[in-house]
From Swiss-Prot:
Region (Disordered) location: 967-1016
Name used for this protein in its record: Receptor-type tyrosine-protein phosphatase dep-1
Organism name: Caenorhabditis elegans
Result of knocking out the encoding gene: RNAi-mediated knockdown in a lip-1 zh15 mutant background causes the descendants of P5.p and/or P7.p vulva precursor cells to adopt a mixed primary and secondary cell fate. Multivulva formation in 19 percent of animals. RNAi-mediated knockdown in a let-23 sy-1 mutant background partially restores vulva induction.
Transmembrane stretches, start-end: 902-922
Tissue specificity note: Initially expressed in vulva precursor cells P5.p, P6.p and P7.p. Expression is later restricted to P5.px and P7.px and their descendants P5.pxx and P7.pxx with higher levels in the cells proximal to P6.p descendants.
Tyrosine-protein phosphatase domain: residues covered: 1072-1334
């Protein structure tokens, strides 16, 4: 069954195949896409290397097909024979098999096999000869050589290709010409193939076809168009026309073809720098006009091009003629005594030299050559000198030459004119004695030279002619004066009797004997001089003057009829006040009145006589002007105008500062000023004479008016005075109310009358001269009584030094503190009359019956010592205490202490001990709470503070009373803790807690409170003194400006500053200490990251003085080195700028170069040094400047030189030059070094005068900086002395402008920029004393205690104590 099915399937397939074959044969002619099954055909594109086998789409017997290839070529070697190959069908191309990589000309046997289920059967086998392949003459191994009449083609045959022969077909394209076909047999053993095509025409295109043949088959042809090389040009002709163009023509070979011609021309000297031109083959010439320079030597290279072939070049060299000279002229050369031919040459041509030919009637023809010169303006010239005779005719011919090629000639026939030069001949033409005179030179040597030149270029027989013709006067124009002269006769030529002021034209020229006139003439117009006049001052007043004008000599009217006088009068500012022209006549003698002049002004009179200014004058003859001698005069003085900008400013309660500017119109020399001072509300007026000198740059006059009285109002007027009298009153009459202040300190102390001293009373006497009303009228006086101890000190129980009690309030004390015994109004008394006042103390026996807070003059204690002082009042709050009287003891001795009193005292002492023990136990338990409360001002409440103060006061009072009764308070204090009794210091405090008069205070009879122990002050052991009372918050003093934020700023008006310092100094500078402690934490906690870098720590002199990051000075650091921009310095604000100063530490040896780098980069004009290099054996600052003057030292890249040095008592000033190399060269700057050496470390100078002088001198000499460059200030750490100096400088500037003085705010502001500025309390107090010293002038410096701390012993005025008043 299976076999039957297989045979049936084969029959069906055979039927289909036969049917398909019949269909394909039927449609073969109608469809190109139908292929015979398994057809073997050579590829149409590559018939020499590829065969294509067609396969059926679906074959019932085979699944795939393969084509086996075998090279069956006969008579070839095995090396040439191709290897066997097999190609199979693929899914990518299932309908054909492409056989490739076959060899041209080889015969191959191709067998097609079918495959199915592993069995293979041969389907078809056929033999095919591959087409031959023509050689490729464009390949790398090929070469085509083209000549004018032949072409040679060479290549290397491919060993694998087979051919029998080659045929070469070639023909000329245009015009068409056919050549015989070349047949060449192939020689297999010959690898190189060469074809030669001869008998060709030059310059034509040829079509070449090369075909390979094999077994009757021909290859596809190799086709190319080849061009023969054209023939070179036969000749090139070059013609230079009359212009600047060059005509280039050529002749080509008539049998040679050409597409275009190439012309390449260049200078023969620079053949590589050429210009190329392409010309169509239809042209045979070209013009070159712009690119060739006349006179240069050129070469032209001409070639013919056909296709890509170029003929042999034809080189032609030629020389262009230079351009002829533009023009020439012949002039006489007086210096050489010859005629000079000067030719101007064109710049657009090369010219080497000039050829000059000269011929005359009597002179032989001569040829000369001259070199070329170039003028400053860029023109080319040539010149030549000839020894020719003037007055004769000569023919000149000149041409340019370049490389022996001559240009066209420029010819002229010239008659040589005689020479003439007015200046060269040394002639002088001048007005003389009413005429015009021509003068020859006086020097014989010069005249010898003139005669020699005259004979050569003028002519020995030639003459000099002078013509003088009047101008502008019609009736005289024909009256020309003629004169002749020559060097043979050197007498002057004089034309006399000319009209004064008239204008004449003078002509000078030379003439030969043949009548030839010189080409050069001297023309000059001369106007005869004007008549002279004298101008004199006839009279002068304050506002007018009279001038008289007369002629110097007599003139007739005709000689001056055309002249005018121009007179101009100007004031001292150059402004014209009189300007007038007047016609001159023979009788001209006017008087000129000048009115409206200003008093005491200088005037100048300028007079000119102008002749020839009429309308009939010609512009050729300008007017003649004669200037007369200038006359000056001054008007008389007058009363001055009012002064300007009158201002008044009170200085204190009894003096003012009056300022004004001088009058705008002084109207004379000011002798003085009269100042009228009037007290408002009275007829009292006084006049003060003030000098006119002023040492200020703005000429402001300043005067201090004294002897005024506080509390009164005054008006001021100022008048300037000249010798003419008093000027006007000032338009503004300023008034000022004098401030009311505490009375001046009396110079005398009250005196207790010894004979009046009793057991309970005494009489005190004091003069009325202590009632000084300068600071205001004294309204009251009070008598202050103080009991003293055995050492004559005053009981200090009351907290305030100025606080006082009443008589009844002091009864509870064993030693009475100060109390007011009497308060009495003062009647007006004359201060210059010495009248004594007597007052009895202790006269009132009824004081126990009145209220305790009432003032009462109760009995004194017997056998007790007392001091008395007088308190003077200008108002209830303004008072001053006199010095205390001598100590006086009342009568009768103190009785013995009874036994019961001693027992009572012992009981009190035991009670005090028990209370103290209980308190100490409580103190230890609350220690932490107290420490926390002490860190803040707003800690414990005021109520607890008052309770604790009351407890301490009560315990100290009881102990003092007991010890006093036992006689244990008589211990003498150490010498260092006491001060003289006549120099106490007091403060103003209102005692509201003791019930005393709030307007009365008690003076402090002791010295500095901090230097005395509690036992010395109260008789109690010092251990009680150490008991803390917590932070005490004090309200700012009344002297601080109201409304200020007292946590950051405490400004004080200038007029209140003295009182402010006194109040701050009271109680041993307690308020100074309290205020300084408030700034302890200002600025603390700000970032100091740069200072704490490990690489920067060695750059800090002190580890606790870092540099704040936000304000530190940064050095330039171009290489970005870590820490390279760090220096321990900060910007600190001053008066004028936020960065007016740089506060820096004293340089270390390792930071010295950084210090100078900072100085250079910040462009600092000055350096302030406030420390010595070594103090007390310790290094405080490295010496960063050179040791010797004018010896440069290099610090880093900055050269430092001291150019000058000046020493003072306390400081040294050095001028230092800094030099540094930069991109623009070496840059030089100057820095002034201020070195103050009298300032101790951690302290203050002993006296402010030195540092004030130093600060003022620095500020006066500080140069102006256009960049607002900062000044460097340093000490050792750069905080203490540096901060103090900056504060002083800033506050002195502020006070000079009248601004409030804010020491507290200034220091706070600095501490925000650099830590610990103003390092201790002593320096803080010193700032106040410096400012006060400047404001008051006479105040002495603060002194120092034995411990070295700042000590305030009080201010001294007029040699006496100042006692400050309370609120």
């Amino acid at each position: 069954m299976i076999r039957w099915k297989y045979e049936l399937h084969s029959l069906i397939w055979l039927f289909l195949v036969l049917h398909l074959s019949k269909c394909q044969s039927d449609s073969l002619t109608t469809s190109a896409e139908q292929h015979e099954l398994f057809a073997i055909k050579k590829d149409s594109l590559s018939p020499w290397s590829q065969i294509l086998v067609s396969l059926p789409r679906r074959h019932p017997l085979y699944q795939s097909f393969a084509a086996k290839i075998q090279d069956v070529t006969e008579n070839i070697s095995d090396e040439v024979r191709d290897s066997n190959k097999t190609f199979v069908s693929s899914d990518d191309a299932p309908y054909s098999i492409r056989i490739h990589a076959l060899r041209a000309g080889h015969r191959y046997s191709i067998a097609i096999h079918g495959q199915k289920d592993g069995s293979t059967s041969l389907i078809k086998e056929e033999s095919v000869v591959m087409d031959p392949r023509a050689p490729d003459f464009r390949s790398m191994d090929s070469d085509i050589q083209v000549a004018e009449h032949n072409i040679t083609m060479r290549t290397i045959k491919n060993d694998s290709y087979l051919q029998d022969s080659f045929s070469i077909e070639y023909r000329q394209i245009n015009p068409d010409k056919k050549f015989p076909v070349l047949q060449i047999l192939d020689i297999p053993e010959q690898k190189n193939l060469e074809f030669y095509l001869g008998n060709l025409n030059s310059g034509f295109d040829y079509s070449v076809r090369v075909i390979a043949h094999k077994d009757g088959m021909s290859s596809r042809p190799w086709i190319s168009t080849l061009t023969t090389k054209p023939s070179p040009l036969k000749e090139v002709n070059i013609n230079q026309n009359a212009g600047s163009c060059v005509e280039v023509s050529w002749q080509n070979d008539e049998f040679s073809g050409a597409d275009f011609y190439t012309i390449q021309y260049s200078l023969q000297s620079t053949p590589n720098n050429s210009t190329n031109m392409t010309i169509p083959s239809t042209e045979s010439s070209i013009s070159i006009c712009d690119s060739m320079l006349q006179g240069e030597a050129y070469q032209i290279i001409a070639t013919v091009q056909k296709g890509g072939q170029v003929s042999e070049p034809l080189i032609t060299k030629f020389q262009l003629r230079p351009l002829p000279p533009i023009d020439f002229r012949v002039r006489a050369d007086l210096k050489r005594g010859k005629y000079k031919l000067l030719a101007e040459l064109p710049t657009s041509s090369k010219i080497d030299k000039c050829q000059i030919t000269v011929a005359g009637d009597e002179a032989e023809r001569s040829v000369n050559y001259a070199n070329i010169e170039q003028t400053k303006s860029g023109h080319k010239i040539c010149w030549f000198n000839f020894a020719l005779s003037p007055g004769e005719r000569f023919d000149f011919s000149i041409s340019s030459m370049a490389n022996e090629s001559a240009s066209q000639k420029l010819q002229k026939s010239i008659v040589l004119t005689p020479a003439f030069d007015f200046n060269a001949f040394g002639l002088t033409l001048q007005e003389s004695n009413g005429g015009i005179e021509l003068i020859w030179p006086k020097s014989e040597v010069f005249m010898t030279r003139v005669k020699d030149i005259w004979n050569k270029v003028v002519g020995a027989e030639s003459l000099l002619n002078m013509r003088i013709t009047p101008i502008g006067n019609n009736d005289e124009t024909d009256k020309t004066l003629k004169f002749e002269t020559s060097p043979k006769n050197i007498d002057p030529v004089f034309a006399k009797n000319l009209v004064k002021g008239a204008c004449y034209r003078v002509q000078l020229f030379t003439v030969t004997k043949t009548g030839i006139i010189s080409e050069t003439r001297h023309n000059e117009t001369i106007r005869m001089s004007s008549p002279a006049v004298n101008v004199s001052l006839e009279s002068v007043t304050r506002s007018s003057a009279t001038l008289r004008i007369v002629f110097s000599t007599h003139h007739d009217s005709t000689s001056i009829s055309n002249c005018q006088m121009h007179i101009v009068v100007r004031d001292m500012n150059g402004k014209s006040v009189f300007d007038k022209r007047m016609q001159l006549t023979a009788t001209f003698a006017p008087l000129l009145n000048l009115d409206g002049l200003s008093p005491f002004h200088k005037y100048t009179v300028n007079t000119q006589i102008i002749c020839g200014s009429g309308s009939s004058e010609t512009p050729q003859c300008p007017a003649a002007t004669r200037t007369m001698r200038q006359l000056s005069f001054s008007t008389r003085q007058d009363k001055p105008a009012a002064v300007q900008d009158l201002k008044v400013e009170p200085l204190n309660s009894y003096s003012v500062m009056l300022t004004w500017l001088p009058p705008a119109l002084p109207n004379g020399i000011l002798t003085h000023y009269a100042v009228n001072v009037t007290k408002i509300g009275s007829d009292e007026t006084r006049t003060i004479d003030v000098g006119v000198s002023s040492n200020r740059s703005d000429h402001t006059v300043q005067v201090v008016i004294d002897e005024l009285f506080g509390g009164h109002t005054y008006s001021f007027s100022v008048r300037a005075v000249t010798e003419a009298g008093f000027g006007e009153n000032s338009p503004v009459v300023p008034t000022v109310s004098m401030p009311l202040m505490a009375p001046p300190v009396p110079t005398v102390a009250p005196m207790i009358m010894k004979e009046s001293v009793g057991s309970h009373n005494m009489i005190v006497r004091f003069p009325t001269t202590m009632f000084d009303n300068r600071n205001g009228e004294i309204k009251q006086f009070a008598i202050i009584v103080s009991e003293t101890t055995a050492d004559e000190s005053i009981n200090r129980w009351i907290e305030s030094d100025n606080g006082t009690y009443t008589w009844q309030q002091v009864q509870r004390f064993d030693v009475w503190p100060s109390y007011v015994a009497k308060l009495q109004d003062i009647q007006k008394v004359k201060q210059d009359v010495d009248v004594s006042i007597f007052e009895e103390l202790g006269e009132d026996e009824t004081c126990l019956e009145v209220r305790a807070d009432r003032i009462c003059n109760g009995p004194l204690r017997s056998a007790s010592k007392y001091r008395v002082r007088i308190r003077l009042f200008t108002s209830p709050t303004l008072f001053t205490d006199s010095p205390p009287s001598q100590v006086m003891t009342t009568g009768s001795a103190t009785p013995a202490i009874p036994l019961l009193t001693v027992v009572a005292v012992l009981i009190v002492i035991a009670f005090v001990g028990i209370v103290g023990t209980i308190f100490l136990f409580f103190w230890n338990r609350t220690k932490k709470a107290r420490l926390a409360a002490a860190a803040f001002k707003n800690g414990p409440s005021k109520e607890k503070e008052s309770q604790w103060e009351a407890l301490k006061m009560m315990m100290a009072e009881r102990a003092a009373d007991c010890l006093a009764k036992l006689g244990l308070d008589a211990t003498t204090p150490p010498p260092s803790s006491t001060t003289s009794s006549n120099s106490p210091t007091s403060t103003s405090t209102t005692m509201t807690d003791c019930g005393s008069n709030p307007h009365l205070g008690a003076p402090n009879a002791g010295g500095h409170r901090r230097t005395r122990s509690l036992r010395e002050r109260t008789g109690v052991e010092h251990r009680l003194e150490r008991l803390s009372s917590g932070p005490v918050h004090r309200t700012p003093l009344y002297t601080v400006v109201t409304g200020a934020n007292t946590n950051k700023s405490r400004p004080v008006r200038i007029e209140d500053f003295a009182d402010h310092v006194r109040l701050m100094s009271a109680d041993s500078d307690f308020r100074f200490s309290e205020e300084y402690d408030m700034m302890r934490n200002v600025g603390v906690g700000q970032s100091v990251a740069a200072s704490e870098l490990p690489i920067n720590r060695p750059k800090n002199r002190f580890t606790n003085i870092p540099s704040y990051d936000h304000s530190r000075v940064k050095l330039s650091n171009p290489n970005n080195i870590e820490g390279g921009d760090y220096i321990n310095a900060n910007y600190v604000p001053g008066f004028s700028s936020r960065r007016e100063f740089i506060a820096a530490q004293g340089p270390l040896p390792t930071t010295r170069d950084h210090f100078w780098q900072m100085t250079w980069e910040q462009q600092c004009p000055a350096i302030i040094a406030l420390t010595k290099c070594v103090e007390k054996g310790r290094d405080k600052c490295h010496q960063y400047w050179p040791d010797h003057e004018n010896v440069p030292v290099l610090y880093g890249d900055i050269e430092v030189t001291i150019v000058a040095e000046k020493e003072f008592d306390e400081f040294v000033i050095r001028d230092i030059r800094l030099e540094k190399s930069g991109p623009d060269g070496r840059v030089t700057r100057f820095v002034r070094h201020w070195h103050y050496m009298a300032w101790p470390d951690f302290g203050a100078p002993s006296h402010p005068n030195g540092i004030i002088q130093f600060s003022r001198m620095f500020r006066h000499h500080l140069p102006h900086s256009p960049h607002n460059a900062p000044t460097i200030v340093h000490c050792s750490a750069g905080v203490g002395r540096s901060g103090t100096f900056i504060s002083i400088d800033r506050l002195l500037q502020s006070s000079s402008f009248g601004d409030p003085i804010d020491v507290f705010g200034t220091v706070c502001e600095m501490r925000y920029e650099r830590c610990q500025m103003v390092q201790n309390e002593q320096q803080y107090i010193f700032i106040h004393y410096c400012i006060l010293q400047v404001l008051q002038g006479s105040s002495p410096s603060p002194t120092s205690t034995s411990t070295g701390a700042h000590h305030n012993a009080g201010f001294v005025q007029d040699g006496q104590m100042i006692v400050e008043s309370g609120f």
